UniProtKB/Swiss-Prot annotation:
Domain characteristics, as noted in the entry: Resistance to charybdotoxin (CTX) toxin is mediated by the extracellular domain.
Organism superkingdom: Eukaryota
GO cellular component, one term: voltage-gated potassium channel complex
Subcellular location: Membrane
Name the UniProt record assigns to this protein: Calcium-activated potassium channel subunit beta-4
Example GO molecular function: voltage-gated monoatomic ion channel activity involved in regulation of presynaptic membrane potential
Function summary: Regulatory subunit of the calcium activated potassium KCNMA1 (maxiK) channel. Modulates the calcium sensitivity and gating kinetics of KCNMA1, thereby contributing to KCNMA1 channel diversity. Decreases the gating kinetics and calcium sensitivity of the KCNMA1 channel, but with fast deactivation kinetics. May decrease KCNMA1 channel openings at low calcium concentrations but increases channel openings at high calcium concentrations. Makes KCNMA1 channel resistant to 100 nM charybdotoxin (CTX) toxin concentrations.
Its membrane topology: Multi-pass membrane protein
Topological domains, Cytoplasmic: 1-19, 189-210
Alphabetical UniProt keywords: Glycoprotein, Ion channel, Ion transport, Membrane, Phosphoprotein, Transmembrane, Transmembrane helix, Transport
Amino acid sequence: MAKLRVSYEYTEAEDKSIRLGLFLIVSGILSLFIFGFCWLSPALQDLQATAANCTVLSVQQIGEVFECTFTCGTDCRGTSQYPCVQVYVNNSESNSRALLHSDQHQLLTNPKCSYIPPCKRENQKNSESVMNWQQYWKDEIGSQPFTCYFNQHQRPEDVLLQRTHDEIALLHCFLWPVVAFVVGVLIVVLTICAKSLAVKAEAMKKRKFS
């Protein structure tokens, strides 16, 4: 009976296989939770945006300045300021006035402005970046129609110039955690089943020769 108990013990290779399977299962579950809570909501809002044609109504600075954070090395950080420019457009789908934003991230970071420049240490460089962007919309785009994206149910008063996420990125972010979970389950189940079959075969052999 003692020998039969010993035969149920897993070998070092089997133990490593089960540990690997459990690691993949836990990693897959944690990845799904992380993506679900931290990334899924803004991504779905972005993907729910409908494409439309927009034309510029006005481009202007509103006289307010906002802070941004710049980096100047590994342990070097600071804040500087940039002026707020607003680009109002006409949305062809709803035929209404809306504030243009670069993308979903910019909208969530500063919903009052249309553009956030790459943050530099000098305020003057930030102002120049905003001015160049403002002139681009005034002179080069003007009244030309362009593609924009809006979500009538979430933020009908805002439109996006581009989407940050697409369906392929969303698929990959959920595909690989699920694959890791399934592979982990298969490794654990197959290892346990293989061990169980080996133990049964050993028991049958002992009964046969006893």
